[in-house]
Amino acid sequence: MDVLGAAALALFLVPLLIVAEQGRTWGWGSPAALALFALGAAGLAVFIPVELRRGDEAILPLGLFRRGSIALCSAVNFTIGVGIFGTVTTLPLFLQMVQGRTPTQAGLVVIPFMLGTIASQMVSGKLIASSGRFKKLAIVGLGSMAGALLAMATTGATTPMWGIVLIVLWLGVGIGLSQTVITSPMQNSAPKSQLGVANGASACAGQIGGSTGIAVLFSVMFAVALGRLADLLHTPRYERLLTDPAITGDPANHRFLDMAESGQGAGINLDDTSLLNGIDARLMQPVTDSFAHGFHIMFLPGGVVLLAGFVMTWFLRELQEETAPEEERPAESGAGAKNGPLPASDA
């Protein structure tokens, strides 16, 4: 049992996950963040030599990544994690902050995403089972996800809800195709005794990509949006609004006005978006413009990362093109030859 390898892997991943969650609050260059980065680097420095020394008994045999399909599929899963987790999780927030939708309306947009994912997984599974080919499905899947995120980068406050739903459905179809087929070349390339390890490594790459995407893309979005909002709140036109009797006399505006006048306008607490419910449209306009710009900047790099994954899928090899190592092939002259053909499975 590779206890030391498991401990080193935890020492590598856990500090990075903590920074991914808290980095925007602490600051990426804060002492706490830098200390955790250093701790994660130390964990990686211990993990690699330990795993190399353990060989096939390692918790993550690094020799697996010498097989092109396993390394490539892990890289593609990483790009999917970055692009999807870093953007899909923000769609409800986009609908609330930019389009003024209610939390219920914003949450319902996840339904077409799930429907597209489930339907495309079922279809792609049947196609692979009947033909044994997956490369075209992977290309279409990654291309669809990249196209959907780039399309999201063009949306704004006036985009109709049906347009958002179509893009989200398109995104769901793409991820359903990709998730189903991306494991096929990896499983075909891995030794039978290490299929579970290969699957786990690929899934881990996707989770790391998701954490990275959430941390980086969220930080980019908030930095752009709140920086722009701070500038807009200090324009002479907006400062006049803060003293307009029609604005100050409306109780619905009071919480927002208190925040703006205290100099915290760029620090809107997005854990409680009720602050923005019912406020005057003139007060809301800078918030909408700022976050629309921030979301555009976030969706664009997410789409670019998925385009990189799309390019990688062109290098996947079909099942028929993969050949297992000689020692992994079943012996044709062994038990099977002596005892006759194995009975067909009822499955």
Curated annotation (Swiss-Prot):
Keywords, sorted A to Z: Antibiotic resistance, Antiport, Cell membrane, Hydrogen ion transport, Ion transport, Membrane, Plasmid, Transmembrane, Transmembrane helix, Transport
Pfam families linked: MFS_1
Any Gene Ontology CC annotation: plasma membrane
Recorded topology in the membrane: Multi-pass membrane protein
TM ranges: 3-20, 30-52, 73-95, 108-130, 137-156, 161-183, 204-226, 294-316
Major location category of this protein: membrane
Gene3D superfamilies to which the protein is assigned, alphabetical: MFS general substrate transporter like domains
InterPro entries: MFS, MFS_trans_sf
An individual GO BP term: proton transmembrane transport
A Gene Ontology molecular function term of the record: antiporter activity
Entry's localization field: Cell membrane
Start and end residues of each stretch annotated as Disordered: 321-347
Lineage: superkingdom: Bacteria
The family this protein is said to belong to: Belongs to the major facilitator superfamily. TCR/Tet family.
Protein's job: Resistance to tetracycline by an active tetracycline efflux. This is an energy-dependent process that decreases the accumulation of the antibiotic in whole cells. This protein functions as a metal-tetracycline/H(+) antiporter.
UniProt name for this protein: Tetracycline resistance determinant
